[in-house]
Amino acid sequence: VKNEKRNPILKLGDHIKGLFKNPDRRKVKDRIMGDNGYWFESEIKKNKHVDRISRISSIDEYLRREHAILARPNFEFKGKTFETAKIILQTLKSIIRFHTGYICSNPVSLTGDKELVSFLNKVYKKGSYNKTDMEVAKELVSYGDAFEYVYLDDNDIIRSKIIRNKDSYPVYDGHGTYISFIEYWKDEETREDNYVIYYPDRVEVYENQKLVDTKVNLTGLPIWYSAMDKSRYDKFGDPFILDLIPLMDTIENLLSKLDDAVTTLSLNPLGVVSGQRIDSSIPNNIVGTVLNLEDGSDFKYASADMDRDSIKLELDYIIQQFFSVACVPSSILGQSNVSNVSETSITMLYQQTDNFCKQYIASMQEGFAKRLEYMRKLLEIKGITITDEVFDSISVSFNVNRPVDNKSDMKNMKMQHECGAMSKQTIIDRSPYTTDTSLEMERIEAERIKEEQNTSGDSQEVNRTDADMETDSKLENMIDGKAD
């Protein structure tokens, strides 16, 4: 990392002048409104965007507790309207939190050139990128896509903005090349249309079909994270949450009907009289309700015997399929008990979760590489130059939040280090107790130097003591000689 003495403000000014000095015809054409409005107004109405936004809206509604079970009708019971049970389970939120935390609850580790890693860790800390990574993972798991724009704020701090999925419209050409990005939303109070159009070199802001601001794009198009499972339009990720919603609807429907059956048939059964009822006076001193029936008549409660085994079989199978599709160990949400589990058993228990999350991690690693390129651009504008060799040494690794036997792992790494098969830096990289490798290496080096200085000081003290003893011995001999 090398600092340039050139004023970064002047460098930024040159970049702006070069951008607007000779705008090409395509840029001018983009700002001209045609008979059908601007090009981006028709772009967001295309089927591929409408299809994706409708999926996002359905997921948002479900996460806001707007489930299909709420449409279940009431019925008449004992001459009154019986309000049916509408049990809503928000298990999907727990599934999203689990996968998000599994991927990013432990901060990612940067490895490579020691000096650059230390510098980037400071950039990550100032820009609150641990939280940004969590937001990216949550958007990706929930909707199949995530969008991040890297920028330089007013205080010259590198930050990222996570653009909401329902406001995001990535644009690609007929060859599948990502060429621009539209951020669109409608103001809830004024109902005004707001557009932010991202080009590779500039950002334009429109309010009610009027261009109100144009800014220089110092980085590039928003980073597009996309899941490996694709939707009908293969550029967009397919949210796996949509696979869980039908299963959850079935579970809610079964539980709601079961609740109604218990309430009506078991707790409030219907009374049935067979025969003729006699209307005659009843003594006033009798407590309670009495039915006068003619001889041979009968009164009993009508109740239904529920097939418990069949209900349990269906419900258990649906729940089993739900956790299989969600790729979550059933013990996480209290469906089974786990005790005295070995390291091998934990690995097997989380194998499906690992395979599921590795796909998202691969997409995020690709996006993080793009983020580092954008950070490099912003650092160059600030006067900090990074060589290709140093920049290419940087890599990002994820520390998934899987329960592991840390004692066993540290013991194995210690054995490898003692055999000369692993360095201290690799141990620090893989250790669950450290996140900043370069800082730990600096501290270890400082401790080593301090110990050497202490050892050297002790050695000098010992040497001085030996010399003093030798001098004392010579003096004694001289004194004895003179005495003789």
Regions found by a protein language model. Give the residues of each.
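Extended, charged amphipathic alpha-helical segments
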Residues: 5, 212-348, 385, 397
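Extended, helix-rich architectural segments
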Residues: 1-158, 480-484
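Substrate-recognition/cap regions that form aromatic- and gly/pro-loop-enriched pockets
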Residues: 370-386
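Extended, non-catalytic structural segments that build the interaction scaffolds
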Residues: 68-82, 292-325, 330-332, 341-366, ...
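Extended, compositionally biased alpha-helical segments that mediate assembly or anchoring
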Residues: 441-484
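Extended, regular secondary-structure scaffolds
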Residues: 137, 141-142, 147-237
